[in-house]
Each structure stands twice: as C-alpha cells, then as structure tokens.
Amino acid sequence: QRMSRGLGDVYKRQVLGVVFISADYALYIFSDPFPVNIQLLDSFGVSLTIDKLSGFFISTNAIVTAAVIFYCWDRQKTAFFYMQVTILHGSVNASFICADFISLYVALEVISIASFLLIAYPRSDRSIWVGLRYLFVSNTAMLFYLVGAVLVYQTHHSFNFIGLQGAPSEAIALIFLGLLVKGGIFVSGLWLPLTHSESESPAVS
C-alpha cells in the first residue's frame, strides 16, 4: 500500500505532464488554420479530424483534468487511480477528434471502462454495485448506438458521420438514443443521480 502511494506521487506528476501536453497541443490547433484529416481505414470511412472545435474541447478537458489532479494532490491516491485518470483523459480527447461512428464507439467504450474503475475505486460493496450498474446501462445504450451505426454502413458503405445524410430514420433514432442515454440526458433519473451521489468527487468530475 505504501509503495502504491509512492508510485501514485510519481504518476500524478506524469498525469499533470500529459495534461500540459494536451493543453499545449490545443493551443497549436488554434494556431493552425487548416484542419488535419487522418484516414485510418479509408474503405470503411474510419477517420480522425483535428480542427479548432476539437481543440476547444481538448483544452476544456485539460482544464478539468488538471483541476481533478490538484484536488487529489494531498489525498494519497494510488498509482492505479492516476493511471485510470490518464486513460480517461486520453480517451475523452480521442472522442473529440473522431469523424466516424466506429472510432467514436471505441473511444466511448474505453471511457466507460475507465469511469467504472474510478467509480469502484473505493472498493466498497456500494461503490462496486453502483459502478457495475453504470457499466451495464452504458454498454446497453451503446448497443443501440452500434446497431444504428451498422444501419448507416449498410446504406452508404461507410461509417463516416457524413453517412447520417440519407440514412434511415431508424439508424438516426438508435444512434441518438444510445448517445443520449450514455450522456445521461435521456432516462437519467433511473441511474445517474445515485451514480453521482455514491461516487467520489474526482470520478464524477
């Protein structure tokens, strides 16, 4: 336990370094007038787009993560906690630059896993139960999203966001249903209040 907390002191400085790199890169994005497009799987429309809008969200994520790190600075968190914060920070940044449904799906699933581990970090029966419930609701919501993404691909043979134009109404409904439930906007009263009330402040942030 003492060694884990000692490693935690090292990790929290590393996480802070990652946050500063994210903020610096966001400033670089603001200075670049042209967006950057990266094709991962061209035949499937799997790609990333880095523009000023994503730079704004990346800088916001850096500010929030930095606030969490400073809040936890003297709270004796272990290396595992800071590792999950790093994974969560990176996956949230990844979701901001996704330009297709599959890349966004992967990023959101990684966010769900990292969030579950942070919710269950106290390792009490209550926190583990709340974390598992959050993971179940999140994964169920993303199944609707994934079915909608497949319907978009069947129509346009591409997972790119542009495929929403002309996509079946069922695909649009399933995608938005999954995202709204995942984001805690739709039917949030069934699970979100208890998740926030039972989780530690850094995990909720």
Language model features with spans:
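Membrane-interface helix-boundary motifs at transmembrane edges
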Residues: 9-12, 71-81, 123-129, 133, ...
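Transmembrane helix-loop junctions and nearby membrane-interface residues
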Residues: 26-33, 66-76, 97-100, 120, ...
